[in-house]
Amino acid sequence: TAPAVDAVAPEVFVCLDAHLDLREEYDGNAWSHACVTRRVLQTAEEAIILGARTGSEAEWERADAEDVTVVAPDDVDDWLADSPDFGDRSAYLSVDIDAADPGVAPGTGTMEPFGLAPRQLRDVVRTVAPHCEGFDVVEVNDRDDGQAAALAGKLCREFVFAHAAAADRAAGDH
């Protein structure tokens, strides 16, 4: 994710993730999966982390800074209802599949209970996609019967459709 964000240099990084990923380093590695959002903030001006439900004490302290907004799973629907306004700021959307509740997407490396429903993930993708210059889905593995991969594929499709529809509207092609 971090190199892709660096390539498109968005102003806002939006991620669906169970974890804050704001560590300075993890096991001596500044590029660990536990440090992604911290690295991204070297490029993006702001990070919005949707669905986060775990992090170290230092990560929660870093999340208190002005450039980070954390939206708990129970508050994601309210965030969507408030119709987030990106204005003319560019965004990058990253979906870490562990944002989903592990009951619907167990195929990930670090499951956390009480996650988001597929509908919530889809709604975030549809809302943010029109503002995006980049998108990814990460941390999907084969530890289940394909549930996580199927959800990831559907979210990719939703992104492509929503992004293309917004581009068509902007070009005047209805």
Question: Could you say what each language-model-derived stretch is?
Answer:
Residues T1-H174:
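Conserved alpha-helical scaffold segments that buttress catalytic/binding sites
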